[in-house]
Amino acid sequence: MGPARTALPSRPLNPMTGLFLSAWLVFPLLLLGVCGGSGLLVRRVSGGAVSGVLLLPVGFALTVAVCTLGTSMTWLAPYAGGLAVVVALVGLVLERSSLHVAGRRVSGVVLYPAIAAFVAFAVFAAPVLLTGTPSWTGFGRIVDTAFQMAFAQHLAEAGRSVPIGNSSFNETILGLTGNGYPGGAQATLGAMAGVIRTDVPWCYQAFQAWAAAMGALALYALLRRAVAQPLMCCVGAAVASQPNILYDYALQGGIKELTTASLILLVAALLVERLPGPRSLRSSLALAPAIAAAVAAFSYGVTPWLGLLLPAAFVLSLLRPGGRMRTLASWGVLAIATLLLAIPSVISSIKLFGDLTTAVNGVVELGLGNLTAPIPEISSAGVWISNDYRFPLLAHASASHVFDALVIALAAIGVLYALRRRLWMVAAFGLATPIALTYWVAHGGPWIELKAYTITATMVLAMAFVGAGSLTSLARNRATIALKIAAWIGAIAVTGAVLYGNALTYHYISLAPAARYKQLAEIGERFAGVGPAFYPAFDEYAEYFLRKEHGYDLVKPPGLQVRAGAVNLPAGQFAYALDLNQLELSFVQRFPLLVITRSSIASRPPANFDLVDQTSEFQAWRRVRPASEVVLHLPLSGSPTERTHHFCRGLRASVRRAGAGSSVAYVPAGPRAELVPTDMTHPRYWRALGTEALRAYGAGAIEGSVQLGAGGTYEISMSGSVARPVTLYVDGHRAGSVANQERYPGQFLHFARLSLSAGTHRIRLSRGNAGVSPGSGDGPDTSSGVIGPLIFALDQPQNGRLMVVPGSDAGRVCTAHAGYQWIEVLAPGARAVS
């Protein structure tokens, strides 16, 4: 016998690792299986009219249609994901024999489209996938991303029903369901995430990447009908699926536009491969899921494109020799099948009829949205080398225009080539692209136009590669060699320009702090049903994670009652963070649960609240005693000298009015020191943001010293927002580091808890060079590098060091040389204790 083996203790899986695997392994595999099975079902029903390349995209379209149908009915919504899985299983069972055959025929025919799809998936996944955390992109850039996540969750749980109860989450949902907002992509995301029991935000980026991959497969199928070289088709499909303007917009929340682009491309690819005709009425059924899914994803917005492609296909099918009556019958079958699949989308879109009427007869004007200036039409050519689409193009404007001219020239050659070769549907696709865009520009404002540019860019790039491919396929002779070389150079140049532009976006895109939201999600689950809850900060994602508590935040606050003079804001503006001391007591007492971000300067909630949960980022406080216990709440700033004789007389009078047996509660303000970056040694190229903060550019450091009046354990935090790592050194020793922790103004980042002695300590805050990691660049948005005041706060008891004394001690407490967060008068019999 060998030596005995000692069993090693098993290590539990890190929750973030589990979420990452769920989002980036289980979820894509689920989509692969569901879309594959659904595609096989469509192939079976259509009599084999779906090619191998389009199997997954057609299955994706059917999945979108099924999930939209399922979420259109409240009672069926929770089972929409299961319904899509059942549909896929039916396809897998019916077509199981074809799977065995396909398994023995893996060749270059499969390899090239697979590479194109993989590249598209990887490019959209890279900013998150390479971090190893289940995050998402575009954090803090636009609140719409959170709203799309909320919509996806609601559709998967309750369909398009009107939400019950008041909360910021429900107000968002009411605004979306009330106006018929299209939800094909969101319904699919929510339903599929529900199948694996994973919250929508963790799966959001993977769904985006999958939608892009489906677009790449559709593009490959379209290109191979006009381009002879598989390599050119592969490159063209991979590149055209990620035009700069679409990539940038998708990484900042454009789930609707990315999905719609892929579905419109699928419709075009199916029409290019096979027009409805007299040979088989069933064959036209392959188109029905694609059209229905496109309508589900973008509602009436798909009309400018499909309104040109489908009539063109109809006319072309009737011009072909053969039985016209059977061709008409084939179109009739398609119309009926499409209508059946699209009924939920049509019904929900009725609420948008007013917008449709405006779009036909006038201009749908939504202003600039989150743009700082209108984006020109030329961006729809596919090359728009920018690190953030919201800002005007400056550094690479000339280069972008040169490459766009090249793209347009190649696209024009592609249209001429298609006409010459009588590839009528390819030509119709190329001609419909600028016509549809012209309509959008004529009937929409800057924000609406942007959405059209994102979708159009995929089509223009596709036709550019048709043009390049047509030149490379010319007969070999001396006269054509130069054209062939020029065509390949042009294709490579366009590819390089698109990839370079997207690399800039990757470099400057923001990432959500995943671990932070995992903590908030856990609080949301732990206190589900305890509400309404209040989250006194501007954070659109808090609405989602606190939805089960009917949470409110400052994005959609519930009629804030701000204490007079507490917040100095110009009329019409809002606060990004509020201290509870800045709010009226009656307002705070409306909420049984308070969820607040941990901060060294935050005030403790009123005395009838107890701390019931705490993480490194958040605290949950529950109202455990009646609001009537707190008779008076007097907010203070922590200064020992702020309480005047008049103030103390008023406090004693309030105690007398409260009656015999009343008491006084107060919270001593803990010792703390503050370092202001603008007063510290800092690089000259780090410019001031106001009087206290710096906007950091590039690498550099700030240095100074802090004087601590007492020794002990200090919580070190900073008001700011950072992307690339920022490291804190105390007396030459590394104390802590933060990265990818962007925040809105007035919110804090936590560096470390350190045991420090009384006296002077040298402080250095260092910011390194940008690396290859996503979001490490310095874009025009300031949130990637805001260095605010450093706070050194002496550790306090978790429950806020609440002190309660008899009312007779009110004078002593008030006149003591000590700073307080607040003082409260408690009613007789109040049970709050120190």
Regions found by a protein language model. Name each.
Residues V494-A497, H507-Y517, I523-P570, F587, ...:
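Short periplasmic/luminal acceptor-recognition loop of GT-C membrane glycosyltransferases, typified by
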Residues A146, A209, E257, A261-L263, ...:
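Hydrophobic/aromatic-rich transmembrane helices and adjacent perimembrane loops
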Residues A312-P321, V333-L340, S380-W424, S470:
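Hydrophobic, aromatic-rich transmembrane alpha-helices
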Residues L54-C67, V87, L92, A116-A126, ...:
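Membrane-embedded helix bundles of polyisoprenyl
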Residues F118-L263, L393:
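Active-site lumenal/periplasmic loops and adjacent helix-entry segments of GT-C-fold
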Residues A122-V123, A297-V302, S345-V346, G467-S470, ...:
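Transmembrane alpha-helical segments
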Residues L285-I291, W331-L341, A462, A468-N502, ...:
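Signature aromatic-anchored transmembrane alpha helix within multi-pass, membrane-resident enzymes
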Residues G2-G108, R590, G829:
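Membrane-embedded, hydrophobic transmembrane alpha-helices
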